[in-house]
Every structure is written in structure tokens, then in C-alpha cells.
């Protein structure tokens, strides 16, 4: 059973998250031949202040 975890800085719309789930699911089906019912995708919305880029929070970088 393929299980994908996606970490993203918060702020994506529900529609964007749906698209990520659909496309990652399809990629796993194509790559592994797993039935769709067995694919899992978990999106982690990470607050900007909890995401570091080159030693600075994404919030401080204006991301």
C-alpha cells in the first residue's frame, strides 16, 4: 500500500490540495500498479513560522 506524505507551507487552497492528492495518487498507481483503493496521500500544512529556509523562517522571508 503506497503512502505519500507531502509537506507544504500553509496557504494552499482546498482545490490545490485536491489536485495534489489526485496527481500524486495517479503517479503512484502508474509507478506501482497498485489499485487506487490502496493509495494514501497525507498533506502536512506547515505553518510558515515552523518552516526554515537557509536559517530563516518562511514567514520572515515573506513566503
Language-model features and meaning:
Residues 2-63:
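A domain-level signal for the structural core that forms small-molecule/cofactor-binding pockets
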Amino acid at each position: 500500500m503506497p503512502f505519500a506524505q507531502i509537506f507544504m507551507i500553509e496557504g494552499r487552497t482546498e482545490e490545490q490540495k485536491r489536485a495534489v492528492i489526485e496527481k500524486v495518487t495517479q503517479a503512484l498507481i502508474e509507478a506501482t500498479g497498485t489499485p487506487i483503493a490502496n493509495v494514501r496521500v497525507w498533506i502536512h500544512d506547515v505553518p510558515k513560522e515552523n518552516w526554515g529556509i537557509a536559517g530563516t523562517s518562511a514567514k520572515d522571508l515573506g513566503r
